[in-house]
Each structure stands twice: as structure tokens, then as C-alpha cells.
Amino acid sequence: MKETKSAGTQTEKNLMAAFAGESAARNKYTYFASKAKKEGYEQIAALFLKTADNEKEHAKLWFKELNGIGDTAENLLSAAEGENYEWTDMYDGFAKTADEEGFHELAQRFRLVAAIEKHHEERYRALLHNVEMAEVFAKSEVKVWECRNCGHIVIGEKAPEVCPACNHPQSYFEIHAENY
């Protein structure tokens, strides 16, 4: 992704802090909304969610200023690198510290989440490979493709350009998988 005009400045640090703060607030408010709903406060839950949506948009403003959104391949690489940091460095360090401080159950939870982050990295790298090799909607063997809009099934090496049932574009197709 491109470097920003504010690179290396306090303004860049402020943009990163604003993005992090707005992102954290969004998540926190969605958790608060869930709790309010469980306690029977529908209006309060709705207002927490409305505010969470506002915070999401605020975060997006600052993330865009930081040139944080690239094309899909750049975004997949960025996501994979972020997940790699989380499982190889961040959670590993957190687990060691928790163990040293006697929080062994929390250390184990950090390790379990690190394993999930490793899976996330692998998934993003596989998707990046598919994008780079133009293999998102075309495979070397016959697959069952499903339209995510209407559920139409197509069998072949590639997804159709347009769904014959609902006219949605190829981008709505994915490889059909039963997981139940």
C-alpha cells in the first residue's frame, strides 16, 4: 500500500491511534448491545449498535487516510502478515508473560487463539494464491459451484460469468461444500 503524506509524523501516529480507538469502541459497543438485549433493553441495544456503526465509519475515515485499503491482493497480503504477527509474536509473548506471572489458564488461552490466528494466516495466503493465479472462479478439475445469492448449482471447471437463475455476476459463486 502507498505511503501517506503524513508518514513519519505525529499526525500519522494520531491517525493510527484514532483508527485503533474507533475500532475498539465499535467492538465494545456491539458487546454492550448484546448484553443490553439479553437484559431486555431493546432500545438501548439498538442505540449501542447504531453508535457502533458510526464508530466503524469513523475508523474507516482514518484507515483510508493511512492508505490502509488496497486492492484485494494487497489486502489479503496485509491480513496474512497481520495474522502472522499475532500468532508468531504477539500471542506467543502474551502467553510467556502470563505464564511468568502465574496466569497459566490465560496463557493457554493465548496459545489456543494463536493457533486460530495461524489458520487465519494460512487461509488468507491460500486466497491470495487463488487471486494471483486467477483461480478464484476457475479450477483445474470439475467442481460444484453455488450462487451465493439464489443457491443455483453449476458443475464444471469454472463458475459461469452470470448466474443463469438470478442473473447475478460470477462474483457471487463459490465452491459448494456440505459441512454438516
Residue ranges of model-derived segments:
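Non-heme di-metal
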Residues: 1-180
